[in-house]
């Protein structure tokens, strides 16, 4: 090669070329050339890139191993019987439901561990999402809230009746994942291992089914279709809260493969579908006949709700594809008067215990007469809202007392009787004796300073 000057196409320097080693890449037809210095820099960059890529893969593998180790610890610590024992501390009755959810959560964690320890392939384990049904105020949301608290995973509730088919005004199905994302503190990894509860799921049943609810709408089948891939496991894209959805908006991506979906609702009327399936006439089961008492009606409901099968859900208006992605059916019983009475006082976060602590902070001992507790339970049954209304009934009764007692620090006792609940009689405020003072101290509640923020309350059974 004769001596000539060539300009490097990358660094734009002129190079005197004696032979091919001075300019390793050169096309005389186009004049394209790369000098040896630029080639050296490119090779160095590629070596560094490979090294960084290798480190990233190694870090990812270490992270994957660390998460698998964390899952293993959770499984060893939270066997199904341990999960149920924890739920027993907060939830009265619902023994079968607590067992079903304990096993479902345990198996879900085992499935995730299996996926981390084995590369995804033909032998991967399918996800077992849950459908939970029972009357209003029987403990559906409370069960799931305490379950997520024990497992220390994010939990979010979304009202399924607010979801709309794509193209209609309302919330898209992706909002359920977005709610979980914010419940997880905007941590995508935590989001991808959380629990989503779709409440009021029965409200999106097809009206063409045997369910004739006026809240059902033919368009709700589109909502069910929109949930299919999300339930099975897919990458869901959504915009941040407050941002309008448009093509240029930045999106957040979450893989729902390891999110446990639980859908629930009252499914009003499904017991009649079950009754027809088991070939018992409406009259023999009491439907359409005169109801003798609320207790008889509840017993009939509980008897039938535990026999719900996938075909009953199809007749109710849930599409077959959705039912196939909800293999676990969990049913809850109606809470009778005795159960509501226990809920008032027995769980760790019982409403009465909460109010005892609140009043103790004002140097006041709270006492409920037995007939007062019974009156609260009876009123909740009359309202047909289950345990959900217990705290509200007590709040209404004690409003004036809680307004007046902070006026003085003198130790006192507040006594709630049945007349306070039923007739609106003002609760009695009495001096506190030595025994009462001792019991007040045993509550171990410190009076807050004016600048202190009140502690958050536990969730009441719902």
Model-derived features with residue positions:
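Cys/His-coordinated zinc-binding microdomains
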Residues: 12, 36-39
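AAA+ P-loop NTPase nucleotide-binding core of proteostasis motors
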Residues: 2-28, 45, 49-93, 98-156, ...
């Amino acid at each position: 090669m004769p001596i000539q000057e060539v300009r490097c196409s990358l660094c734009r320097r002129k190079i005197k070329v004696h032979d091919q080693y001075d300019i390793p890449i050169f096309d005389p037809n186009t004049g394209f050339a790369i000098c040896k210095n630029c080639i050296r820099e490119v090779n160095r960059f590629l070596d560094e890139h490979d090294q960084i890529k290798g480190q990233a893969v190694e870090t990812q593998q270490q992270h994957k191993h660390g998460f698998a180790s964390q899952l293993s610890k959770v499984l060893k610590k939270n066997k199904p019987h341990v999960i149920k024992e924890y739920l027993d501390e907060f939830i009265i009755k619902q023994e079968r439901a607590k067992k079903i959810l304990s096993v479902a959560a345990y198996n879900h964690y085992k499935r995730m561990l299996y996926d981390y320890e084995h590369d995804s392939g033909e032998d991967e384990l399918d996800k077992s999402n849950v459908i939970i049904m029972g009357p209003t105020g029987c403990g559906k949301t409370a069960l799931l809230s305490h379950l997520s608290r024990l497992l220390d995973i994010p939990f979010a509730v979304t009202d399924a009746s607010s979801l709309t088919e794509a193209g209609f005004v309302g919330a898209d199905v992706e909002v359920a994942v977005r709610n979980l994302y914010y419940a997880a503190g905007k941590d995508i990894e935590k989001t991808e291992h959380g629990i989503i509860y779709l409440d009021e799921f029965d409200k999106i049943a097809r009206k063409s089914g045997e369910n004739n609810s006026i809240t059902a709408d033919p368009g709700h089948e589109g909502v069910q279709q929109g949930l299919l891939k999300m339930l099975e496991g897919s990458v869901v894209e959504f915009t941040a809260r407050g941002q309008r959805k448009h093509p240029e908006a930045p999106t957040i991506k979450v893989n729902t493969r390891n999110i446990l979906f639980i859908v629930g609702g009252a499914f009003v009327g499904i017991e009649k579908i079950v009754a027809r399936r088991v070939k018992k006439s409406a009259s023999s089961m009491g439907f359409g006949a005169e109801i003798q008492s609320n207790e008889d009606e509840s017993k009939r409901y509980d008897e039938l709700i535990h026999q719900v099968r996938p075909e009953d859900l199809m007749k109710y208006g849930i599409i077959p594809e959705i039912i196939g992605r909800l293999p676990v059916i969990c049913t809850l019983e109606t809470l009778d008067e005795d159960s509501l009475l226990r809920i008032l006082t027995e769980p760790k976060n019982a409403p009465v215990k909460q109010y005892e602590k609140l009043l103790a902070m004002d140097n006041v001992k709270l006492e409920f007469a037995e007939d007062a507790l019974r009156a609260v339970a009876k009123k909740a049954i009359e309202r047909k809202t289950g345990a959900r209304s217990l705290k509200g009934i007590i709040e209404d009764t004690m409003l004036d007392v809680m307004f007046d007692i902070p006026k003085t620090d003198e130790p006192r006792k507040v006594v709630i009787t049945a007349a306070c609940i039923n007739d609106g009689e003002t609760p009695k405020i009495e001096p506190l004796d030595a025994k009462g003072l001792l019991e007040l101290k045993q509550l171990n509640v410190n009076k807050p300073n004016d600048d202190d923020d009140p502690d958050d309350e536990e969730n009441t059974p719902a």
